[in-house]
Protein backbone atom coordinates (compact mmCIF):
# COMPACT_ATOMS: atom_id res chain seq x y z
CA UNK A 1 0.00 0.00 0.00
CA UNK A 2 1.43 3.37 -0.99
CA UNK A 3 0.52 5.78 1.80
CA UNK A 4 2.43 8.27 3.88
CA UNK A 5 4.11 6.82 6.93
CA UNK A 6 2.99 7.76 10.40
CA UNK A 7 5.26 7.47 13.41
CA UNK A 8 3.36 6.04 16.37
CA UNK A 9 5.16 7.28 19.51
CA UNK A 10 4.48 4.91 22.42
CA UNK A 11 5.98 5.48 25.88
CA UNK A 12 5.71 2.47 28.16
CA UNK A 13 6.56 1.57 31.73
CA UNK A 14 5.88 -2.00 32.92
CA UNK A 15 2.91 -2.36 30.59
CA UNK A 16 4.13 -5.27 28.45
CA UNK A 17 0.84 -7.07 27.76
CA UNK A 18 -0.93 -3.88 26.70
CA UNK A 19 2.11 -2.75 24.69
CA UNK A 20 2.08 -6.05 22.79
CA UNK A 21 -1.60 -5.50 21.91
CA UNK A 22 -0.94 -1.89 20.85
CA UNK A 23 2.02 -2.97 18.69
CA UNK A 24 0.03 -5.74 17.01
CA UNK A 25 -2.90 -3.41 16.28
CA UNK A 26 -0.59 -0.90 14.58
CA UNK A 27 1.11 -3.62 12.56
CA UNK A 28 -2.37 -4.77 11.41
CA UNK A 29 -2.99 -1.39 9.76
CA UNK A 30 -2.62 -1.21 5.97
CA UNK A 31 0.37 1.14 5.98
CA UNK A 32 3.90 0.13 6.91
CA UNK A 33 4.26 2.69 9.69
CA UNK A 34 7.11 3.49 12.01
CA UNK A 35 6.61 2.54 15.64
CA UNK A 36 8.74 4.26 18.25
CA UNK A 37 8.63 2.54 21.63
CA UNK A 38 10.12 4.41 24.56
CA UNK A 39 10.78 2.02 27.42
CA UNK A 40 10.94 3.98 30.67
CA UNK A 41 12.89 1.70 33.03
CA UNK A 42 10.51 -1.26 32.72
CA UNK A 43 11.28 -4.38 34.74
CA UNK A 44 8.54 -6.63 33.29
CA UNK A 45 10.39 -8.03 30.24
CA UNK A 46 9.47 -5.15 27.92
CA UNK A 47 13.02 -4.60 26.65
CA UNK A 48 13.59 -8.32 26.06
CA UNK A 49 10.34 -8.53 24.06
CA UNK A 50 11.29 -5.45 22.01
CA UNK A 51 14.72 -6.93 21.28
CA UNK A 52 13.10 -10.15 20.02
CA UNK A 53 10.90 -8.46 17.39
CA UNK A 54 13.34 -7.92 14.52
CA UNK A 55 11.15 -5.10 13.13
CA UNK A 56 13.01 -2.73 10.78
CA UNK A 57 10.34 -0.04 11.22
CA UNK A 58 10.64 -0.13 15.01
CA UNK A 59 12.70 2.52 16.75
CA UNK A 60 13.49 1.98 20.40
CA UNK A 61 14.60 4.30 23.15
CA UNK A 62 15.50 2.49 26.34
CA UNK A 63 15.91 4.29 29.63
CA UNK A 64 17.54 1.56 31.74
CA UNK A 65 16.68 3.39 34.97
CA UNK A 66 16.50 3.30 37.85
CA UNK A 67 15.22 6.89 37.58
CA UNK A 68 12.16 7.27 35.39
CA UNK A 69 11.81 10.00 32.78
CA UNK A 70 7.99 10.00 32.87
CA UNK A 71 5.38 9.95 30.13
CA UNK A 72 5.67 13.62 29.12
CA UNK A 73 9.46 13.42 28.86
CA UNK A 74 9.15 10.20 26.89
CA UNK A 75 6.64 11.73 24.45
CA UNK A 76 9.02 14.69 23.98
CA UNK A 77 11.94 12.32 23.33
CA UNK A 78 9.83 10.31 20.88
CA UNK A 79 8.83 13.37 18.90
CA UNK A 80 12.51 14.34 18.65
CA UNK A 81 13.42 10.84 17.42
CA UNK A 82 10.60 10.38 14.89
CA UNK A 83 11.73 10.03 11.27
CA UNK A 84 8.44 10.98 9.63
CA UNK A 85 6.56 14.26 9.35
CA UNK A 86 3.36 12.75 10.74
CA UNK A 87 3.41 11.75 14.40
CA UNK A 88 0.69 10.14 16.48
CA UNK A 89 0.95 10.14 20.27
CA UNK A 90 -0.17 6.66 21.25
CA UNK A 91 -0.38 5.21 24.75
CA UNK A 92 0.78 1.66 25.43
CA UNK A 93 -2.75 0.68 26.49
CA UNK A 94 -4.38 1.85 23.26
CA UNK A 95 -5.51 -0.26 20.31
CA UNK A 96 -5.48 1.10 16.76
CA UNK A 97 -8.86 0.61 15.11
CA UNK A 98 -8.90 -0.78 11.56
CA UNK A 99 -8.22 2.00 9.03
CA UNK A 100 -7.08 4.45 11.71
CA UNK A 101 -4.13 5.41 9.53
CA UNK A 102 -6.30 5.90 6.45
CA UNK A 103 -8.69 8.19 8.35
CA UNK A 104 -5.88 10.20 9.97
CA UNK A 105 -4.18 10.77 6.61
CA UNK A 106 -7.48 11.59 4.89
CA UNK A 107 -8.16 14.49 7.26
CA UNK A 108 -4.61 15.75 7.71
CA UNK A 109 -3.98 19.06 5.99
CA UNK A 110 -1.01 21.40 6.33
CA UNK A 111 -1.19 23.30 9.61
CA UNK A 112 -3.88 21.09 11.16
CA UNK A 113 -4.03 18.68 14.03
CA UNK A 114 -6.06 15.50 13.63
CA UNK A 115 -7.14 13.40 16.57
CA UNK A 116 -8.89 10.10 17.00
CA UNK A 117 -11.71 9.41 19.43
CA UNK A 118 -10.71 7.38 22.45
CA UNK A 119 -12.95 4.47 23.29
CA UNK A 120 -12.65 3.47 26.93
CA UNK A 121 -14.35 1.01 29.25
CA UNK A 122 -16.68 2.72 31.71
CA UNK A 123 -14.09 3.09 34.48
CA UNK A 124 -13.94 6.88 34.34
CA UNK A 125 -16.49 9.61 33.62
CA UNK A 126 -17.46 10.27 30.01
CA UNK A 127 -16.04 13.31 28.27
CA UNK A 128 -16.14 15.06 24.91
CA UNK A 129 -12.86 13.46 23.83
CA UNK A 130 -13.93 9.85 24.35
CA UNK A 131 -16.70 7.29 24.15
CA UNK A 132 -17.49 4.77 26.85
CA UNK A 133 -17.82 1.23 25.50
CA UNK A 134 -16.88 -2.00 27.21
CA UNK A 135 -14.85 -4.38 25.04
CA UNK A 136 -12.90 -5.61 28.07
CA UNK A 137 -10.75 -3.93 30.66
CA UNK A 138 -7.77 -6.26 30.94
CA UNK A 139 -5.78 -7.67 28.01
CA UNK A 140 -7.12 -11.18 28.57
CA UNK A 141 -10.71 -9.87 28.54
CA UNK A 142 -10.37 -7.54 25.55
CA UNK A 143 -12.53 -8.72 22.64
CA UNK A 144 -10.67 -7.41 19.59
CA UNK A 145 -13.17 -8.95 17.16
CA UNK A 146 -16.12 -7.27 18.88
CA UNK A 147 -14.21 -3.96 18.89
CA UNK A 148 -13.25 -4.23 15.20
CA UNK A 149 -16.81 -5.18 14.25
CA UNK A 150 -18.20 -2.19 16.16
CA UNK A 151 -15.69 0.16 14.50
CA UNK A 152 -16.48 -1.23 11.05
CA UNK A 153 -20.28 -1.32 11.36
CA UNK A 154 -21.67 0.79 14.20
CA UNK A 155 -19.20 3.54 15.13
CA UNK A 156 -20.31 7.12 14.60
CA UNK A 157 -17.79 9.84 15.54
CA UNK A 158 -18.72 12.30 18.28
CA UNK A 159 -17.10 15.15 16.36
CA UNK A 160 -16.12 15.56 12.73
CA UNK A 161 -16.32 12.82 10.14
CA UNK A 162 -14.74 9.52 9.26
Language-model-detected regions and their locations in the chain:
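N-proximal low-complexity "stem/linker" segments adjacent to membrane-targeting elements
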Residues: 1-25
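Conserved short acidic donor-positioning loop in nucleotide-sugar-dependent glycosyltransferases
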Residues: 26, 40-41, 66
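A conserved acidic beta->alpha catalytic loop
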Residues: 39-48
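Short aromatic/hydrophobic "clamp" motif used to bind/position activated sugar donors
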Residues: 87
Amino acid sequence: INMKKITFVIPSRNNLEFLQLAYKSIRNLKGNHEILVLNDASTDGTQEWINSLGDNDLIVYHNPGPERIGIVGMFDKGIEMARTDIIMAFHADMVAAPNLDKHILKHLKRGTVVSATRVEPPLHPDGPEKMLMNFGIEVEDFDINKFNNWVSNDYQPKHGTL
